[in-house]
Amino acid sequence: MIRTSVSFLLTATLSTLSVTAATTAPSIDSVKKGTYGIDSAHTQVGFSISHFGFTNYAGLFAGATGTLILDPAHPANDKLDVTIPVDSIVTTVPKLTDELKGGQWFDSAKFPQASYNSSAVAVGPGGDITITGNLTLHGVTKPLTLHAHLMGTGVNPISKKYTVGFEAKGKITRTDFGVSLYAPALGEEVELLIAGAFELQE
């Protein structure tokens, strides 16, 4: 139930980005070429982990900053660079949120930022987007592939800025990043669900 609620929150934030967005996913070819800045207020990095095999427990990170270079005619030129404040982590339990920021988990005091930097972007049939790159978390850098699709594009009716929104999914193994408390009983595989909104920089 928690996972479903967070997933709904992550995806729903993009549904009203554009008054011109179609009911079906728009074509990546419709996106304007240029450099985009992350709309931090509407970008969330959700995660889900098996809680001792009983439930899938979810939380999210917020406050991401960074840039996205888009060239629809030449996807090989696309580039994504994101920085995430680790202490932005939030769950439905305040005590757990505080624990996750501590030294036994993400240690946000020592490692205040996580980052993702793409190395290649490919657009496949049907507009499926594959992003390869490196995730740096807890002082460790590992490869991470994201599978994304365009959610919407157009002028945001509130900010009046040209905006594009994507949803992306990926998986990491937390022990690879030195976050190993209670492993393997507490799930090692972490599923990522990312809602990303980006505003064209004039």
Model feature map: region roles:
Residues A21-E202:
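Low-complexity, acidic/polar, glycine-enriched regions of mature
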